[in-house]
From Swiss-Prot:
InterPro entries: HATPase_C_sf, His_kinase_dom, PAS, PAS-like_dom_sf, PAS_fold, sCache_3, Sensor-like_sf, Sig_transdc_His_kin-like_C. GO terms for molecular function: ATP binding; phosphorelay sensor kinase activity. It comes from the Bacteria. Its main location: membrane. This is Sensor protein CitS. GO terms for biological process: regulation of DNA-templated transcription. It is a multi-pass membrane protein. Residues 35-174 are extracellular. It is an enzyme of class 2 (transferase).
């Protein structure tokens, strides 16, 4: 394609187009106003001519003059005085034979009226306005019949204004109108220039082709980002998003379904409206979007020190959280194995002591007793708990409790036979582990001799229900509202106050609830309820 030597800029093109548009618009408007004004003026002049003619036809002296020997001597002075007073071009009065009794040119009195538009007045007795070419030229005239006292038509009055004079008036008015139009056109062109410069500044001096290229580049970058991105205007309506964001919101939504919608229609609990109001960014905040947990960053967008929108980026929290939970579970397993190893070592030492003392029977009794206890626990979990991971965690925690000198009792009617979803299993292991760790810490810090923990669980009904109770000092009433806050702890030391906060987050993610009560053992009693079908947001 051949390039122009001097290519026109977008501003120049726009200015030229708008200028042509303004000129064409005002030219058409001028022509329309010209026609409208000419038509209106002609109608006004016609009505004026008709009203003068009607007034003349009703003058008694004029009507009586038709029966005089020389009507023109009476009628001509009357008609002329009225013509001069009203500014009419002519007032012609004639009889039924169209012989003139009055005319602005006296030499034409006695001659026949011309124009061919008198029949309606003389024959039908009508009053009307007509256009015709008379002896003085083209004119607009009002025609009125003259009646005698008996209602008989005895003549006609014709009052007119020459078209030439009307066109002159129209021309004078049009000159003034076109002067105004020209001034408005000049102002319009100046406005066009201002608009063109404003657009140029708003587009940072970029041409449409450059804007298009940058838009495509931005779109490619936006879609290649692994993080979800959603931008809104100051009203909170979506102006930009990428496909990664739609994976969180709804992969089936089209672009047309998203753009222009309020962000809260797509993400229920988003805090972007808050960012728009406050004007401060929010970083690394957790938010549930659909069935996914995300880590969100939100920042306002400023233009000329004014908030014009906001943008949110978010990434999947599940991978990070899953890794964290796996590490937590590994720690629980490690603690359980360490406890079992330590407990097994203690039992071996006990057996060794019996054997060294020669008390074979006591050693055998001890082994059988321990074997029975282990078999009872294993048999219980095989019969009453369907999920091996949950069973393993509970067994490990029981061993850890025994090592710490804590007696663990599980309600014999407890059961967990309903299969767990993968996410439910992962979070349930975290919740059980943290609740039991919390109970261990509370009992060890209390100094109580007979430390006890009571556990019960059931899957009867629509929910999974878990209860963990201890005989420790419990939670003071004034701290019950704060116990689940991240970083809050009743125990001294750093890196505390996260266990119960994690439990609460996990419970809420599964659509459940956690309650803190005073247990029958006198200590704290935590009750979890989790829907069997994992809740989805919205």
């Amino acid at each position: 394609m051949k390039r122009r030597l001097f290519p026109l800029t977008f501003s120049a093109k726009m200015m030229g187009f708008i200028a042509l548009l303004i000129i064409a618009m005002f030219v058409l408007l001028g022509v329309f106003l010209n026609e409208q004004y000419a038509r209106t003026l002609e109608e006004q002049m016609g009505e004026r001519a008709l009203s003068v003619a009607q007034a003349v036809a009703l003058i008694p002296e004029l009507r009586e003059a038709f029966s005089a020997e020389r009507p023109d001597e009476i009628i001509q002075p009357i008609a002329e005085s009225i013509r001069v007073e009203t500014g009419a071009e002519f007032i012609v009065v004639g009889n039924t034979d169209l012989i003139r009794y009055a005319h602005p040119l006296p030499e034409r009195i006695g001659q026949r009226m011309v124009g061919g538009d008198n029949e309606r007045a003389l024959v039908h007795g009508e009053s009307y306005v007509s256009k015709a070419v008379g002896s003085l030229g083209p004119s607009i005239r009002g025609k009125v019949p003259v009646f005698d006292d008996n209602g008989k038509i005895i003549g006609i009055v014709s009052v007119g204004f020459l078209m030439e004079d009307i066109q002159q008036v129209i021309g004078e008015r049009l000159i003034a109108m076109w002067q105004i139009v020209v001034v408005i056109m000049i102002l319009g062109l100046m406005g066009t220039w201002l608009v063109a410069n404003t657009v140029k500044k708003a587009t940072l001096g970029l041409e449409p082709e450059e804007i298009g290229q940058q838009f495509q580049q931005k779109e490619a970058i936006l879609q290649s980002i692994h993080e979800g991105v959603i931008a809104v205007n100051k009203e909170g309506k979506v102006t930009l998003f990428n496909q990664a964001a739609m994976k969180y919101v709804d992969p089936e939504l089209d672009k047309e379904d998203v753009l222009g919608r309020h962000v809260t229609d797509l993400v229920k609990h988003t805090r972007l409206p808050e960012v728009l109001q406050v004007g401060k960014g929010q970083y690394d905040q957790e938010l549930r979007i659909g069935d996914k947990q995300a880590v969100v960053n939100r920042v306002p967008i400023y233009y000329d020190h004014e908030i014009v929108g906001a943008v949110a980026t978010f990434r999947d929290r599940n991978e990070i959280k899953k890794l964290s939970e796996e590490l937590t579970n590994v720690k629980n397993y490690a603690d359980a194995l360490r406890a079992q190893t330590h407990e097994f070592s203690n039992k071996l030492n006990t057996i060794s002591g019996f054997l060294q003392l020669g008390k074979i029977d006591e050693a055998v009794d001890f082994i059988q007793k321990e074997r029975k206890i282990q078999q009872e626990w294993i048999h219980f979990f095989i019969e009453r708990v369907n999920d091996p991971t949950v069973s393993a965690v509970l067994l490990g925690k029981i061993s850890q409790a025994q090592e710490l000198g804590i007696d663990v009792d599980i309600d014999p009617s407890s059961q967990l036979l309903t299969p767990l979803q993968e996410r439910q299993q992962e979070l349930l292991v975290t919740m059980i582990g943290n609740l039991l760790e919390n109970a261990f810490d509370a009992l060890l810090a209390s100094g109580i001799e007979n430390k006890k923990i009571y556990i019960s669980f059931t899957d009867m009904g629509d929910d999974f229900i878990f209860e963990v109770e201890d005989n420790g000092p419990g939670i003071p009433p004034q701290l019950m509202e704060s116990i689940f806050e991240e970083g809050f702890s009743t125990k001294e030391g750093t890196h505390r106050g996260f266990g119960l906060a994690l439990v609460k987050k996990a419970v809420h993610e599964l659509g459940g609830a956690i309650f803190l009560e005073e247990g029958e053992l006198g200590g704290a009693c935590f009750v979890l309820t989790i829907p069997k079908h994992e809740a989805k947001e919205g």
